Amino acid sequence: MRALIVDDSSFVREYLRHLLDRMGIACEEAVDGSDALAVLTDEKEFDLMLLDVNMPVMNGLECVKALREAKMHPEMKVMMVTTEADNSFITRALDNGADEFLMKPFTPESLREKMMLLGFAA
């Protein structure tokens, strides 16, 4: 299994990589939505993208919308990593193509639970 971690915070990227490495998941990283789309056009296959919402250049909502509109990696699951939990945001993210949410701050257990909801054994 392969995951793409997209977050402008190096701390969050390193923490997610550490947790996913412990689950046996290979990871690559991107610093914003634009960088993520560039990685995804390199013909690499990913099963999961963990996508921060608030980033410079291209935010997570713009990225997931562009990804789904371009029909890039249609089988890849997108988990939004966010501090925003209001219903209007969740509706907007789901409408743009997100599959699940991981609320910051998160624990290893909450990440595992969300992975299982997406159908990944964690």
Predicted features by range, described:
Residues 14-22:
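Charged docking surfaces used in two-component/phosphorelay signaling
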